[in-house]
């Protein structure tokens, strides 16, 4: 069964088709409610989510956003710093420290499930949380096998989603040869002054090309521009 979903996820031609295959895979693994988010960490701002899939109850999701639970959600916080999958119970086994966390976790209807954190270079990340629909006794029997299967599906779906997003970016924001050159040398750690000497142009022109690339890629720093260009397949280093 899982092998079938692997093939279908890899073959998904757009984000909507991929989300549908991901949802079907989650159902087959007895997941009652899931969330998938992907984006990047922004210096001084924290995580910025670019894609989000969920089958969560709209009323709960609305309350979650209105109350700002995402800022103190212990599952999210743990997922941003851990590198291996973990159970909801691993987090909820200790009492919350903040009143906001206590409020959220009292209202949170899911106590057993799995979080799969996924981290890539240059601050890219993805995260899947999956609340089980299994009865408590079956969950205890099967949870490690379920964790392995959900983790594989999450990793494959996230990789494919990143690839599709990169293809869309490459089509929407083509970079000029000069913009690519300045980003390529930036990726090698060269300063604007050094890039100017290498390319035989002025430092001001280097900054202009880098700034233009940043605008096209919708990022705020040179490092983010390099990361996004590499992820999109626009830049080979």
Range-by-range predicted roles:
Residues 38-62:
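GAF sensory/regulatory domain recognition
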Residues 99-123:
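Helix-to-coil/beta transition segments that act as allosteric "coupling" elements at the rims
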Residues 178-182:
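The N-cap/first-turn positions of alpha helices
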Residues 222-233:
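Short, basic, alpha-helical segments at the C-terminal edge of helix-turn-helix-like DNA-binding modules
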Residues 21-26, 30-43:
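Short, hydrophobic-rich beta-strand element in sensory/regulatory alpha-beta domains
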Residues 1-8, 15, 19, 126-176:
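Juxtadomain coupling helices with adjacent low-complexity linkers
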Residues 54-98, 103-106:
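Regulatory sensory and allosteric helical modules in signal-transduction proteins
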Residues 191-224:
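Recognition helix of helix-turn-helix DNA-binding domains
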């Amino acid at each position: 069964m899982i092998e079938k979903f692997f093939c279908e996820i890899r073959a998904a031609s757009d984000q909507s088709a991929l989300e549908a295959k991901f949802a079907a895979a989650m159902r087959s693994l007895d997941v009652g409610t899931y969330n998938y988010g992907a984006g990047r960490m922004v210096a001084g701002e924290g995580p910025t989510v670019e894609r989000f899939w969920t089958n969560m109850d709209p009323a709960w999701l609305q309350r979650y956003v209105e109350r700002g639970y995402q800022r103190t959600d212990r599952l999210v916080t743990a997922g941003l710093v851990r590198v291996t999958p973990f159970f909801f119970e691993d987090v909820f086994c200790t009492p919350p420290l903040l009143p906001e966390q206590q409020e959220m976790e009292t209202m949170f209807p899911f106590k057993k499930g799995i979080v799969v954190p996924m981290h890539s270079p240059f601050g890219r990340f993805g995260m899947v949380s999956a609340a089980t629909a299994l009865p408590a006794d079956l969950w205890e029997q099967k949870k490690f096998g379920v964790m392995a299967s959900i983790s594989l599906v999450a990793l494959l779906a996230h990789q494919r989603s990143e690839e599709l997003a990169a293809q869309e970016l490459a089509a929407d924001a083509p970079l000029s040869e000069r913009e690519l050159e300045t980003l390529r040398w930036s990726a090698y750690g060269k300063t604007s002054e050094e890039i100017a000497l290498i390319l035989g142009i002025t430092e001001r022109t280097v900054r202009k090309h880098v700034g233009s690339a940043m605008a096209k890629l919708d990022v705020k720093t040179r490092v983010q521009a390099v990361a996004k260009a590499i992820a999109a397949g626009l830049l080979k280093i």
